[in-house]
């Protein structure tokens, strides 16, 4: 993105809340009514074509449970407990959301040199407007000021990056890293034998310490992969170099 296109931070929260559905940008369309109709039609028409569901309310509850976990490690057992159906059913339903482009399963980065990496994927909602409607965050202001603002911010950034690859006809070469010591890197983009580490922070005061986990990447063999400078995507309104190999970028650069 170019400097003149940067959005003010409050506009980002409007976009996060509004979501991606083009019709929502027509002034006459009510956000709440639109998403209620969208979910109802999606389950009645699309889901029922793909699988047998006994209860629309169960599937709606499932979508709410997934939306509430956007950006978290996918724990099928926990979701099954919330919804009151079997783990196998949750796995099947998650596959349907994937096929429909409603969620994305972000795989953990795998490399023999990073021994402690966990192997569970994370799940992300690809439309933060739908995520907000399902979890009843009804205005941009409540999202921005609420306890889940980091979750919405991260989901928005990840979905924007995923869509940018899709728009170029590419399968996103993106991963995350977390290990058994709770060290984590939000996103790793592996492209042309180069790793691009990204941290996503809702803060407007980015610091070098926020990217400390990037040091783990030095364990990777330099003859196989090169490590690009790290990036912290955040709410500070300008591009800011925090170190020679670390830049903080405004979310509006996406």
Q: Which functions belong to the PLM regions below?
A:
Residues 1, 235-254:
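Domain-level recognition of nuclease-like catalytic cores that cleave nucleotide substrates
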Residues 25-195:
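Accessory nucleic acid-recognition modules appended to NTPase machines
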Residues 133, 207-209, 239-243:
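Switch/connector loops and helix/strand junctions flanking conserved nucleotide-binding motifs
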Residues 166-167, 215-226:
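Arginine/glycine-rich "motif VI" loop of SF2 helicases in the C-terminal RecA-like domain
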Residues 190, 195-206:
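Active-site ExK catalytic segment of metal-dependent nucleases
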Residues 203-220:
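Mg2+/Mn2+-dependent nuclease catalytic core
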Residues 226-234:
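Short, hydrophobic beta-strand segments that form beta-sheet elements in well-ordered domains
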